[in-house]
C-alpha cells in the first residue's frame, strides 16, 4: 500500500525526521466529529494502534458498526466495532496486510485489500459477522489499492498502481462484475485516486493532480466522458458524499473539512462551498491517497484521532540532527 518514511538519512550522516503527534502511532481513538468540529470519543477509554503508515475506518450502511484497520503484534487486520460502546471483534487473521475496508451495500460483508497471496494487493471479501472464510473477489495483474461500487454492485471502481510513494501511475478503472478486462475511468498522465461514487451511483468524485496539486473532480458515471467538473480550488483530498447525495465533503489544502453543496438531479452543479472545521488542529487522521474517514446519515463524521484521549494537540515538529552517525558510533564505543 502507500507508505511514507518519517525520516531521512543523508550520506554525510545528517538525520532529518518528523516527531509525529504525542502518543505515537500506537495511540489512537475512534471519534465522532460534528459539522462545527466538536469531537466526542465513540467509546471513551478504548484506544488502538491504527498503524504507522496509514489508517482506515468505514461505517456500515446502517450506521451501527465500523470496520477499522488495526495494527497488532499479529499484523494489520480488519476489526469490527459495534457502535458506540459495543464489543470489538477481529475479522481477519492472515499475517498479510489487510487494509482499506469497505462494506457491501447490504452490510453483510466487508471488502478489503490484502497482499496475502504474495503477488501484490488483491480484493477480498468476508462476511462481517465472522462466519465463513474470506475469499478472493478480484485478483488482477496490477495491485488493487481502492474499491467502490454503485448501489446495484454491477461494477467495481478500482484504483490501480502507486506503490511505495510512486507518482503519476495511480489510475481509476472500471470492471463489470464477471468481466476480466478493465476500462479506464480516470487514467491520465497524473495521479487519480480516492474514488467515491454518489449514493445514487450517477456521479464519480475523485482527486487528481492534473493541476500540479490534488483537487477534487466529478464525472458522470459510468459514462465518464460526458462531462467533468472541478469541485475544489484551494487543494482537495479525500472526497466523500453525504448519504443524501447533496454534499461532497473533502479536506482542502489548509487541512480544513469542506462541505460543497451540489445538485445532480439534472446535470451536475456545485452551488456552494464552506469550510467546516480544521482536521489538523484536532489531530484527525486523513489519508493522502484515499479517504480514511466516513460520514454518518445524521451528518457526523466518523474519524480517527491520533495521540489518544489525553493528547493536547501537540503538532508535528521537523528535527534536523547533524553528525548523527558520529554520535551513534561514539555511543557504540562506550
Please provide the spans of the model-predicted regions:
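Conserved beta-propeller blade repeats
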Residues: 1-18, 45-69, 93-115, 139-162, ...
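Beta-propeller blade-edge and WD-like acidic-aromatic loop motif
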Residues: 14, 22-41, 65, 69-90, ...
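Active-site and glycan-interaction determinants of carbohydrate-active enzymes
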Residues: 304
Amino acid at each position: 500500500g502507500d507508505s511514507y518514511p518519517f525520516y531521512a538519512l543523508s550520506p554525510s550522516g545528517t538525520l532529518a525526521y518528523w516527531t509525529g503527534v504525542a502518543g505515537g502511532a500506537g495511540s489512537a481513538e475512534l471519534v465522532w466529529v460534528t459539522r462545527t468540529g466538536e469531537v466526542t470519543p465513540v467509546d471513551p477509554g478504548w484506544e488502538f494502534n491504527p498503524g504507522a503508515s496509514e489508517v482506515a475506518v468505514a461505517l456500515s450502511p446502517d450506521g451501527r458498526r465500523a470496520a477499522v484497520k488495526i495494527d497488532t503484534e499479529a499484523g494489520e487486520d480488519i476489526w469490527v466495532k459495534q457502535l458506540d460502546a459495543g464489543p470489538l471483534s477481529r475479522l481477519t487473521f492472515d499475517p498479510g496486510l489487510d487494509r482499506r475496508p469497505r462494506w457491501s451495500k447490504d452490510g453483510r460483508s466487508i471488502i478489503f485489500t490484502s497482499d496475502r497471496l504474495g503477488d501484490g494487493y488483491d480484493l477480498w471479501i468476508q462476511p462481517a459477522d465472522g462466519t465463513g472464510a474470506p475469499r478472493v473477489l478480484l485478483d488482477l495483474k496490477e495491485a488493487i489499492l481502492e474499491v467502490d461500487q454503485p448501489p446495484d454492485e454491477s461494477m467495481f471502481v478500482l484504483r490501480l498502481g502507486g506503490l511505495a510513494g510512486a507518482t503519476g501511475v495511480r489510475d481509476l478503472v472500471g470492471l463489470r462484475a464477471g468481466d476480466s478486462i478493465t476500462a479506464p475511468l480516470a487514467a491520465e498522465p497524473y495521479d487519480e485516486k480516492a474514488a467515491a461514487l454518489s449514493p445514487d451511483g450517477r456521479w464519480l468524485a475523485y482527486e487528481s493532480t492534473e493541476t500540479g496539486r490534488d483537487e477534487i473532480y466529478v464525472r458522470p458515471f459510468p459514462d465518464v466522458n460526458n462531462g467533468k467538473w472541478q469541485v475544489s480550488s484551494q487543494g482537495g483530498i479525500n472526497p466523500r458524499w453525504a448519504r443524501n447525495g447533496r454534499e461532497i465533503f473533502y479536506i482542502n489544502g489548509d487541512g480544513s473539512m469542506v462541505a460543497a453543496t451540489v445538485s445532480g438531479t439534472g446535470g451536475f452543479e456545485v452551488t456552494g462551498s464552506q469550510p467546516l472545521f480544521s482536521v489538523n488542529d484536532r489531530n484527525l487522521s486523513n489519508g493522502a491517497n484515499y479517504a480514511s474517514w466516513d460520514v454518518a446519515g445524521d451528518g457526523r463524521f466518523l474519524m480517527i484521532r491520533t495521540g489518544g484521549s489525553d493528547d493536547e494537540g501537540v503538532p508535528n515538529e521537523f528535527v534536523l540532527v547533524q553528525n548523527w552517525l558520529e554520535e551513534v558510533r561514539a555511543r557504540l564505543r562506550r
